[in-house]
């Protein structure tokens, strides 16, 4: 795997980024900046006049509120980014305006190569409408989802010493969108697993593990029942593992993995899995360390990288109430900055967020506090100013 900015192997860049962890920041705040491809350096973010142009898709629900928090913090820190905002919504999916905005968001991401994204709502009751979130990942082939699950210092949860990474294949599996009603009352839904994409995500997971000084990679599957589909994923994983003899490997059935994650999450390091299992275990993992409001994530492809909260929660129930926790999107934005090599900005912003949470004075309701979104953002800004 190579850097997105140079032909230098990304491993050294990962390590350079994670070195900061030893000072004050959790490793989740020091996520590696350059892991879009395991093949070649073809990633060229757009930069004009000394600034990077980044696509911003606030998303539905609390998206606009937390996106404003990120924009305010980035502006205060003079981050060299210009936002190209596209207000696409999944709530209005199906009408021409919404479809046009979705196409505009795709074009923007193809042009800029980088995006910061909230979560787009997918109506459960609307038949025939594919999730915009899934369609975007498939259209751009951003095949690897990375969710970083780690305790925040000073914020006590049920488990201590949790530090794991969930890597999820983003473009096939049960999310292929191939389902139909053959006769009334009988639905067929197709799960697609290919050797090529299983191999690609396995190589990504092993490369990520090496680059971030991780020790073990676990394959999550249901090959005891889906012997062909998950059997192919599992066997491909073990074949790829032969090229990484320094890493410990094992595999685990998803039912057991869910139980083990709740009972003893410390046993996991890097976990790689098909699409559906990744969605489930990302949410389980978030619950271990404080909930969806604090877990950052990103989606990587060969040409485009999109950073978004690790748990794909829309938050329609608290929309407009100034109650949302912006931490997940802020930290996802910090990951984006490291991806660009803007480590100084990323470190300053991440440290301020973790210091505010660690002090316990200004926390949003999901973390047991009473602070509003604006109050939390103001506290982060104050921390950044006091550090100068």
From Swiss-Prot:
Transit peptide start and end: 1-35
Domain of life: Eukaryota
Residues in coiled coil: none
Pfam families (alphabetical): Iso_dh
Cell location: Mitochondrion
Uppermost EC category: oxidoreductase
Catalytic activities: D-threo-isocitrate + NAD(+) = 2-oxoglutarate + CO2 + NADH
Keywords: Magnesium, Manganese, Metal-binding, Mitochondrion, NAD, Oxidoreductase, Transit peptide, Tricarboxylic acid cycle
InterPro entries assigned to the protein according to its UniProt record, in alphabetical order: IsoCit/isopropylmalate_DH_CS, Isocitrate_DH_NAD, IsoPropMal-DH-like_dom
Assembly, per entry: Octamer of two non-identical subunits IDH1 and IDH2.
Gene Ontology cellular-component annotations: mitochondrion
Named cofactor requirement(s): Mg(2+); Mn(2+)
Designated name of the protein: Isocitrate dehydrogenase [NAD] subunit 1, mitochondrial
Residues the entry annotates as binding Mg(2+): 255
Cofactor binding description: Binds 1 Mg(2+) or Mn(2+) ion per subunit.
BP-aspect Gene Ontology terms: isocitrate metabolic process; tricarboxylic acid cycle
EC number(s) on file: 1.1.1.41
Function in brief: Performs an essential role in the oxidative function of the citric acid cycle.
PROSITE patterns the record matches: IDH_IMDH
GO MF annotations in UniProt: isocitrate dehydrogenase (NAD+) activity; magnesium ion binding; NAD binding
Homology family: Belongs to the isocitrate and isopropylmalate dehydrogenases family.
Residues flagged as site, Critical for catalysis: 175, 222
Amino-acid positions noted as binding substrate in the UniProt annotation, renumbered to this chain: 137, 168, 255
């Amino acid at each position: 795997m190579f850097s997105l900015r140079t032909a230098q192997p990304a491993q050294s860049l990962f390590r350079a980024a994670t070195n900061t962890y030893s000072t004050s920041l959790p490793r989740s705040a020091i996520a590696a900046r350059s892991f879009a491809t395991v093949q070649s350096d073809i990633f060229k973010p757009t930069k004009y006049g000394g600034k990077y142009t980044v696509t911003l898709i606030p998303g539905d629900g609390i998206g606009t509120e937390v996106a404003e928090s990120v924009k305010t913090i980035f502006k205060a820190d003079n981050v060299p980014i210009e936002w190209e905002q596209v207000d696409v919504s999944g709530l209005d999916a199906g009408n021409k305006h919404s479809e046009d905005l979705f196409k505009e968001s795709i074009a923007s991401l193809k042009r800029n190569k980088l995006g910061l994204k909230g979560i787009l709502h997918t109506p459960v009751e609307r038949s025939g409408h594919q999730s915009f979130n899934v369609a975007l990942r498939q259209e751009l082939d951003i095949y690897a989802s990375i969710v970083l699950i780690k305790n925040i210092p000073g914020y006590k949860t049920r488990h201590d010493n949790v530090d794991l990474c969930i890597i999820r294949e983003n473009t096939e599996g049960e999310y292929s969108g191939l389902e139909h009603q053959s006769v009334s009352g009988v639905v067929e839904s197709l799960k697609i697993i290919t050797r090529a994409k299983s191999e690609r995500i396995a190589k990504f997971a092993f490369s990520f593990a090496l680059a971030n000084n991780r020790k073990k990679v676990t394959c999550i599957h249901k090959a005891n029942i889906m012997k062909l589909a998950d059997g192919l994923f599992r066997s491909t994983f073990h074949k790829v593992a032969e090229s990484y003899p320094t890493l410990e490997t094992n595999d685990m059935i998803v039912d057991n993995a869910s139980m083990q994650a709740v009972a003893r999450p410390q046993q996991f390091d890097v976990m790689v899995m098909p699409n559906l299992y990744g969605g489930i275990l990302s949410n389980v993992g978030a619950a271990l360390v404080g909930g969806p409001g604090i877990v950052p994530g990103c989606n990587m492809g060969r040409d485009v990288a999109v950073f978004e909260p690790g748990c794909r929660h829309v938050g329609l129930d608290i929309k407009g109430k100034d109650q949302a926790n912006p931490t997940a999107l802020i930290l996802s934005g910090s990951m984006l900055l490291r991806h660009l090599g803007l480590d100084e900005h990323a470190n300053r912003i991440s440290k301020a967020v973790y210091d505010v949470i660690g002090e316990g004075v200004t926390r949003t309701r999901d973390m047991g506090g009473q602070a509003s979104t604006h109050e939390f953002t103001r506290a982060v800004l104050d921390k950044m100013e006091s550090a100068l």
